[in-house]
Every structure is written in structure tokens, then in C-alpha cells.
Amino acid sequence: MGNTTSERVSGERHGAKAARAEGGGHGPGKEHKIMVGSTDDPSVFSLPDSKLPGDKEFVPWQQDLDDSVKPTQQARPTVIRWSEGGKEVFISGSFNNWSTKIPLIKSHNDFVAILDLPEGEHQYKFFVDGQWVHDPSEPVVTSQLGTINNLIHVKKSDFEVFDALKLDSMESSETSCRDLSSSPPGPYGQEMYVFRSEERFKSPPILPPHLLQVILNKDTNISCDPALLPEPNHVMLNHLYALSTKDSVMVLSATHRYKKKYVTTLLYKPI
């Protein structure tokens, strides 16, 4: 009896295994997904369309990151000129991906535009009165589509002089601002300056001090010609001097400059 029971239990187990084995071949169109993982099969949780961590899942993001790391080239102001006539002139090129037409401003007989172009080679073409044309007087190149375009090469060396002038102007402006903002030298304190009465109402001198040094009043050196006077100061020029009246004669003098020479004229008038 005991052997019969054990054989029956064993037969039931074999029947269950056989049923599971037969259930695996239901049809070619049905596919069972295993929900319980096994350490022996690393692809248990991998669906047919899933990607492994090593696949190119984030390639576009990585490309954008690489592009952002690249240094951007400095834009340089470039003059574009069209001198072949026309009523309306536009320009377009590889610098704006040929997306828009930039108008040129008429200046006398030419059309001019100043564009900020990055360093390197750029192809461009003019749109004159509704037709695409190129300037025959400028360098040309044939594009991949077989069209003839103008070619311009923007180089950093062409703008070194302008960069130096700009840097010098910035340094001079900073220096001038620093000089204007700096305080004058001298001791500083908390006491306010009090004006005295004689300082407040003191009038300026009748004659500036530098005009008191009249060259006609100076003694001439013995070794010099009496007709030659010492070189006057520039503040003495174009002023009228008068000598004190003596023997009923009035004497007037004035000094003028002619290029590198000075001439002093004396006028005598009896009164």
C-alpha cells in the first residue's frame, strides 16, 4: 500500500511536468514573457526591442555637449560693397545659411553693408532687382550645386590694428576715469574750512602778473645787438603796452609773431 501511494504522487508530479511541457508549444504566434528572473540568464528582463546600457541612447545629447564646449569664433565687422548698379540690392550667404536676404544701403553710386562675420571662409551672393548675381571683381568659387558664388576670407590678422586701437582707447578711457575719480593729494580731516572776510571779498589784480614782465623794460646784454630783444613769452603777444607820458610824447608798443619770428613795434605820438 505504501508503495502504491508513493507511485501515485510521483505520477502526478510527472503529469504536471508533462502538462507544462506541452503548454509551451501552444502556437508559433504566442510568446510568453518570463516574469521570474534567474542569475544564469542575464537577458531575462530584456525585451526584444530593449537596448543595453552600452547602446547609443544618448548620442544626440553628447553631440550637443561637444558643440557647446567648442569655443565660438569672434565676429568681425566686414564691409560688403556692390558697385554694379541697381535699384534694390540684397545679400545672402553661408554665414546665415542662405535663410534671409540682408538689404544693402545705397551710398553715392555703391551699395554698402557692414556685417559681423565670424572668422573663416564664407560664400555669398547678391540679389539685385530680383536676380541672383555675383560680383565679377571679387573672388569667386563654384559650389557643390554648380552655382558661382563670391568668396570672402575673414582673417584675424586683418583686424589686429583695430584691436590694438580699441584696446588703447579702452586703456586711455580707464586711465582718464581713474584720474578724474581719484582725490587730489593732501591731508584730509573732519574740520570744515572757514573763509575769512578778507578772502571772501578779495578782488582780482588789475593786471595779470605775467603781463608785468615787459621785454622793453628788460636790460639788454652788452654783447647783444641793442636792436634785438629777447624772445617774449607767448602770453605777451597781441597786447598793447603804453609808456608813461614824458616830454609830451606818448609811446605805445605791441609784439606780434610771424611764423617763427617776433616783431615788436613802437609808436610815438606827440600830445
UniProtKB/Swiss-Prot annotation:
Q: Annotated Gene Ontology MF terms?
A: enzyme binding; protein kinase binding
State any GO CC term. Answer: cytoplasm
Cross-referenced SUPFAM superfamilies: AMPKBI-like (SSF160219), E set domains (SSF81296)
Give a short account of what the protein does.
Non-catalytic subunit of AMP-activated protein kinase (AMPK), an energy sensor protein kinase that plays a key role in regulating cellular energy metabolism. In response to reduction of intracellular ATP levels, AMPK activates energy-producing pathways and inhibits energy-consuming processes: inhibits protein, carbohydrate and lipid biosynthesis, as well as cell growth and proliferation. AMPK acts via direct phosphorylation of metabolic enzymes, and by longer-term effects via phosphorylation of transcription regulators.
Segments carrying the region annotation (Disordered) are 1-47
Instruction: Please describe the quaternary structure of this protein.
Output: AMPK is a heterotrimer of an alpha catalytic subunit (PRKAA1 or PRKAA2), a beta (PRKAB1 or PRKAB2) and a gamma non-catalytic subunits (PRKAG1, PRKAG2 or PRKAG3).
The family database entries (Pfam families) matched by this protein are listed as: AMPK1_CBM (PF16561), AMPKBI (PF04739)
User: Phosphoserine (modified residue): where?
Assistant: 38, 68, 94, 107, 157, 169, 173, 183
CDD domains cross-referenced by the UniProt entry = E_set_AMPKbeta_like_N
Keyword Transferase appears in the UniProt entry: no
Per the record, the similarity remark reads: Belongs to the 5'-AMP-activated protein kinase beta subunit family.
Give the transmembrane region(s).
Answer: none
Biological process, per Gene Ontology: cellular response to nutrient levels; fatty acid biosynthetic process; positive regulation of cold-induced thermogenesis; signal transduction
What organism does the UniProt record list as the source? Rattus norvegicus
Could you list this entry's UniProt keywords, alphabetically sorted. Answer: Fatty acid biosynthesis, Fatty acid metabolism, Lipid biosynthesis, Lipid metabolism, Phosphoprotein
Residues with the modification Phosphothreonine, per the entry, are: 39, 147
Regarding how it is modified after translation, the entry says: Phosphorylated when associated with the catalytic subunit (PRKAA1 or PRKAA2). Phosphorylated by ULK1 and ULK2; leading to negatively regulate AMPK activity and suggesting the existence of a regulatory feedback loop between ULK1, ULK2 and AMPK.
InterPro entries reported for this sequence: AMPK1_CBM, ASC_dom, ASC_dom_sf, CRP1_MDG1_kinase, Ig-like_fold, Ig_E-set
What's the protein called, per UniProt? Answer: 5'-AMP-activated protein kinase subunit beta-2
